UniProtKB/Swiss-Prot annotation:
It comes from the Bacteria. NCBIfam families: PRK13666.1. This is UPF0358 protein OB1428. It holds the Pfam family DUF1507. Belongs to the UPF0358 family.
Length: 93
């Protein structure tokens, strides 16, 4: 049974990481092709996606599939990458 729990934890972490990567790709495409970061639509999409991911992470933490520290690290890592992306888009204006 412990091996099964480890597998579920690894799978939960991988799924959350994949969702974070999808958000990053979505925002990259939006910045490159659709709108500027100051656009309300951009901000709404980003806020909605980040909120959704935070709820997924909270759910996984409550099920003890990942630790609270791992969840925070996933969000912080995504936020850092998004900030870098945002700064790069500002420098190209």
């Amino acid at each position: 049974m412990p091996d099964l729990m480890i597998d579920h934890r690894e799978k939960a972490h991988a799924l959350l990481k994949a969702d974070a990567d999808k958000i990053l790709r979505l925002i990259e495409v939006q910045i490159e092709n659709l709108t500027m970061p100051q656009c309300p639509v951009y901000e709404d999409v980003l806020d909605t996606q980040m909120y959704g991911l935070s709820r997924e992470i909270d759910f996984a933490v409550r099920l003890e599939l990942i630790s609270e520290i791992e969840g925070k690290a996933l969000l912080e890592n995504l936020e850092k990458k998004l900030n870098i992306l945002h700064e790069a888009s500002q420098n190209t204006l």
